[in-house]
A protein has these predicted regions:
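Asparagine-centered strand-capping/turn motif at beta-strand->loop junctions
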Residues: 39-48, 54-60
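Solvent-exposed beta-strand/loop surfaces of large extracellular or lumenal domains
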Residues: 10-12, 62-112, 191-207
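Short acidic/proline- and small/hydrophobic-mixed sequence motifs that coincide with surface turns
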Residues: 45-50, 74, 86, 173
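Surface-exposed, acidic/Ser/Thr-rich flexible loop segments
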Residues: 59-61, 107-195
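Solvent-exposed, conformationally flexible loop/turn segments
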Residues: 31, 123-127, 203, 213-216
Length: 216
């Protein structure tokens, strides 16, 4: 992949509709395994060549200032179009911004955003299935990297942003399904705080489903 330092400008695609998004996140140990599947439809009268950017956000800590570029923070990322693997054209690094962990949290987290870029075509009047899979290390800072005399253990944090997908058509997804599996945390006696959407939970798996979900 080609690495660049810059920012990505998102362009509205009024004739390309995001029909469905299925997001599955499995949190195991210090890593989150993410599998997201999109059904995208070309409603225009011509074939559309798409340059697609997928953002991944890293929560920055003192440890990651030194090591965030190492492969251990994102050891795996793959794109598939209709089950055929796509080549990552290049990676664009990086935007630095601050964001709250959730709306009730006063703490601001410093984030780094990297964009992974692929090209694909959608024939006129047709739909495609785009899948993105990646493994990312959750943001945290533990006793080995702190300056405290006593060991301290920080929360593991993972953030997923739906907002970039608002540039498809009118920014409304016909169907959005989210599943977050935290069984590994629960069985080890850990606690989980999931915010942003309204979830139901069963045996350590959180579910949320929406129709006509507005990303704007």
């Amino acid at each position: 992949a080609v690495y660049r330092t810059a920012d990505v400008i998102l362009i509205n695609m009024p004739d390309i509709k995001l029909i469905k998004e299925d997001l599955k996140i499995n949190i195991v140990g210090d890593y989150s395994f993410v599998d997201v599947t999109y059904v995208i439809q070309n409603n225009s009268y011509t074939d559309s060549k798409i340059t697609y950017g997928f953002p991944i956000d890293y929560i920055r800590t003192d440890l990651q200032y030194e090591f965030e570029w190492q492969k251990e923070y994102l050891p795996e990322i793959e794109f598939y179009l209709d089950a055929k693997k796509l080549k990552i054209k290049h990676q664009v690094d990086y935007s630095i911004f601050e964001e709250k962990a959730d709306t009730n949290d006063e703490q601001m987290l410093e984030m780094r955003r990297s964009w992974y870029i692929v090209d694909f075509n959608i024939p006129k009047g047709k739909s495609i299935i785009l899948k993105v899979k990646y493994k990312i290390k959750n943001g945290f800072e533990d006793w080995a990297t702190t300056k405290s005399f006593f060991p301290t253990f920080d929360d593991r944090r993972f953030i997923y942003d739906f907002k970039p997908a608002q540039n498809w058509d009118d920014g409304i997804i016909d169907e959005l399904n989210v599943q977050i599996n935290v069984k590994d945390i629960i069985t080890k006696g850990g606690k989980v705080n999931i915010s942003g959407l309204s979830f139901s939970e069963s045996l350590g798996v959180y579910f949320a489903s929406f129709k006509k979900y507005d990303l704007k």
